[in-house]
Regions:
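Short, well-ordered loop/turn sites that connect or cap secondary structure elements
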Residues: 209-210, 229
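Short secondary-structure transition/capping segments
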Residues: 216, 227-230
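Ferredoxin-like alpha/beta domains used as RNA- or RNAP-binding modules
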Residues: 1-198, 221, 228, 241-265
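Short strand-turn-strand beta-turns centered on an Asx-Gly dipeptide
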Residues: 217-219, 238
């Protein structure tokens, strides 16, 4: 199947179509030239779209790895591997570099401050990976194509002065993930029922939210309230955050299902 038909099959439109076309180009480059080839940074939803597209193209998951610069990264590149490369060596060919932007602790800078500053310098989102903000510094994963420019030219976030230096990605400061555990019983594992617990809202409101297209199940849009959620699945909604269904218990005597969700703050 040619590229255009593959993109049509996956329903790719607009910016998503352009992005996914580049993913196929990188896969082709690695295969035909037998060299490592990486995409730009992709969001979790874009990674899911890309995985579906590559599956439709007959490209196995063993042909590429997801890598964001550190274990557990949310934004990641897809690095396509040539035949001669062992996946364990892929980090050597990673296009990801890390900048540490230090600031005075009392300034209380946020993720939004750093992202806004970078985009104000003309750096597009796909060149920027995770931004890990600590009390007095932020570690920013970027592509090698912009790393040197930023190391030399990035001086402030808003009115706050920054001291920027490149560090080894293996030295990133990973903030502790803030999560809240919630336990409940539900009548079924339908998406609307589980969202009612995860987002603390009435089931009818959860169903309406799903039908509006604002909810994603494992980073894929889920517009059907009756879709089944399985243990280990991640559910997210614009404006409401995300949660993971971490445990499904045995049916109670009253016919309800105990569940545990981890809500990310």
């Amino acid at each position: 199947m040619d590229k255009s038909k593959l993109l049509d099959q996956c329903g790719a439109l607009g910016e998503d179509r352009t992005l996914l076309a580049r993913v196929l180009d990188r896969a082709k480059q690695a295969s035909e030239r037998n060299i490592p080839a990486a995409t730009d940074f992709l969001s979790p939803a874009q990674q899911a779209q890309a995985a579906d597209l590559l599956h439709a193209a007959g490209i196995p998951e063993t042909a590429y790895i997801r890598w964001g610069g550190y274990d557990g990264a949310e934004r990641a590149v897809l690095l396509f591997l040539p035949d001669w490369m062992d996946p364990s060596d892929a980090g050597t060919y990673s296009p990801i570099r890390c900048l540490r932007a230090a600031f005075r602790k009392e300034e209380n800078l946020t993720h939004r401050d750093f992202l806004g500053s970078l985009m104000g310098m003309g750096i597009v989102r796909e060149k920027i990976g995770d931004i890990l903000v600590g009390p007095d510094s932020a570690d920013v994963l970027v592509l090698d194509t912009v790393a040197e420019f930023l190391a030399q030219s990035w001086e402030s976030a808003g009115r706050v002065k920054l001291r920027v230096a490149e560090i080894d990605p293996g030295c990133v400061h990973i903030p502790e993930i803030r999560r809240e555990e919630r336990r409940d019983t539900v009548s079924s594992l339908r998406l609307d029922a589980v969202c009612s617990t995860g987002f603390r809202m009435a089931r009818g409101k959860a169903a309406a939210l799903i039908e509006s297209g604002r909810v994603q199940l494992n980073w894929r849009e889920g517009t059907k309230p009756d879709r089944t959620v399985s243990e280990g699945d991640t559910v997210s909604a614009r404006g409401f955050g995300k949660f993971e269904l971490t445990e499904v218990g045995a049916l109670t005597k009253k016919g309800r299902i105990p569940i545990t969700v981890q809500c990310y703050k």
